[in-house]
């Protein structure tokens, strides 16, 4: 049995801690969804809409008002006037401190369907805000995936640039020694120095790009990237064709569902605008207690009332008709916004699908290019040992290998991110990544978009 030394144990413990602290792609996306301000703003918008529903439902409940008053009142009426014994009239006036109190209960019996339609409108707004919160979470998730993959890609490019520079430094040192001994030419030395400077510049550029990628990562995820796990490819989760992806987009994309809910809300607003054309009927129950009013000292007008009241507007200068027509135009506006959203999403889906297809076609050739360049470099090194290649030939092979590996790295990550873009446009990104949504992103009822492009009929 092998016994671990303290140093070996410490190294293994450090490696275990590093692996334990490595952030996965799902963890990064979940962190962004949980903390990003854009999603929190959408959540508060949904919570506000929930309160609007409660406000609208208040129209079904009775209204109770208490009115109380205190003041000084001067009266000149039949209560203060009297006839003198000689038959003459005495116009006496009384100034008294009075108190008034009234308690009134009013219950709506019929309001032209205003309350029920307003409740339906606010509930449609709740669905719109919920689906918009989903859409915002999906956009943030896609952005989180983009910055996550970008950091991984930039780190690989920094490694490639570092290896390329080290190779140039080794060859440059050898050419310098040959030049000092009079074996090599100054032209070879200058050319080697120029290529080494270019390799240094490539490394500086790669390091700056990595710093930018890490800054973007912090902005989206809310923390700096330390150890990141390389995610497993999602090729197996892609639809078979663009047509299948488009159909999934129509059924699942939350932006379309939010836009459709806005159309539903506009239609209910139109129904609300019809209520002024109906009479309103209320049940009224009231009681009052007054003191020192109308010139009478003491309690008077202590009465109660129970009945129904009907009010019906006959003319309002055409305002109600104008509002109805305005809300009709708002329905058309909401439908146009929904249809435009479909066109934009369909375009984004096609572009992401094309990018994925293009990168998928280029990946095998880019890999072949990188593998071939690796073999060429090895062959050049062997031939250099036999005197068949120069040091500049070795630099050529190093540059070719660097460009090939960089191209292969870029194509791989482009293909991977394009697949995530396709899932996002389909509305399946959060589900495929098993991301938990906040409760404010859950709609009260399912909404199916009625938007269609001409070629989808």
What kind of region is each of these model predictions?
Residues 1-21:
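Gram-negative bacterial Sec-dependent N-terminal signal peptides
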Residues 18-69, 75, 108-109, 185, ...:
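Bacterial Sec-pathway N-terminal export signals of envelope proteins
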Residues 23, 139-250, 352-355, 359, ...:
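Periplasmic alpha-helical coiled-coil/stalk elements that build and connect Gram-negative outer-membrane
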Residues 40, 63-83, 90-95, 106-135, ...:
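Small/polar (Gly/Ser/Thr/Ala-rich) solvent-exposed segments
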Residues 41-56, 136, 140-159, 170, ...:
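Amphipathic alpha-helical coiled-coil segments
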Residues 102-104, 148, 307-309, 353:
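Membrane-embedded beta-strand positions in outer-membrane beta-barrel channels/transporters
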Residues 407-457:
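Acidic, low-complexity, intrinsically disordered peripheral segments
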């Amino acid at each position: 049995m092998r016994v671990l030394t303290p140093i070996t144990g410490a190294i293994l413990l450090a490696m275990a801690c590093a692996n334990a602290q490595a952030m996965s792609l799902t963890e990064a996306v979940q962190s962004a969804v949980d903390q990003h301000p854009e999603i929190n703003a959408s959540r508060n918008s949904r919570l506000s809409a929930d309160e609007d529903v409660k406000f609208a439902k208040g129209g079904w409940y009775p209204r109770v008002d208490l009115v109380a008053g205190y003041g000084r009142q001067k009266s000149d009426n039949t209560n203060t006037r009297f006839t003198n014994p000689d038959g003459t009239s005495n116009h006496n006036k009384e100034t008294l401190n009075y108190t008034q109190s009234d308690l009134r209960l009013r219950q709506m019996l019929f309001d032209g369907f205003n309350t029920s339609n307003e409740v339906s409108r606010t509930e449609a707004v709740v669905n719109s805000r919920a689906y918009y919160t989903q859409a915002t979470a999906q956009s943030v998730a896609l952005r989180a995936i983009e910055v996550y993959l970008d950091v991984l890609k930039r780190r690989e490019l920094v490694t490639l640039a570092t290896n390329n520079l080290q190779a140039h430094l080794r060859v440059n040192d050898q050419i310098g020694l040959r030049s000092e001994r009079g074996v090599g030419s100054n032209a070879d030395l200058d050319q080697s120095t120029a290529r080494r400077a270019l390799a240094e510049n490539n490394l500086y550029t790669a390091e700056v790009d990595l710093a930018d990628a890490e800054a973007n990562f912090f902005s989206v995820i809310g923390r700096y990237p330390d150890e990141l796990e390389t995610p497993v490819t999602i090729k197996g989760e892609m639809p078979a064709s663009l047509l299948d992806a488009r159909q999934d987009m129509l059924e699942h994309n939350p932006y379309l569902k939010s836009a459709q809910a806005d159309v539903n809300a506009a239609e209910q607003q139109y129904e609300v605008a019809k209520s002024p054309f109906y009479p309103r009927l209320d049940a009224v129950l009231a009681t009052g207690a007054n003191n020192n009013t109308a010139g009478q000292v003491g309690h008077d007008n202590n009465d109660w009332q129970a009945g129904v009241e009907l009010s019906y507007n006959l003319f309002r200068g055409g305002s109600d008709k104008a509002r109805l027509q305005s809300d009709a135009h708002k329905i058309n506006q909401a439908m146009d916004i929904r249809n435009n959203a479909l066109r934009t999403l369909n375009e984004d889906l096609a572009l992401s699908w094309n990018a994925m297809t293009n990168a998928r076609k280029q990946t095998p050739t880019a890999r072949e290019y990188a593998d071939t360049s690796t073999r060429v470099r090895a062959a050049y090194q062997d031939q250099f040992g036999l005197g068949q290649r120069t040091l500049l030939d070795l630099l050529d092979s190093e540059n070719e290998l660097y460009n090939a590996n960089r191209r292969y790295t870029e194509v791989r990550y482009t293909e991977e991110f394009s697949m995530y873009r396709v899932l996002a446009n389909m509305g399946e990104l959060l589900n495929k990544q098993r991301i938990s949504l906040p409760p404010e992103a859950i709609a009260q009822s399912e909404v199916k978009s009625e938007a269609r492009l001409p070629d989808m009929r």
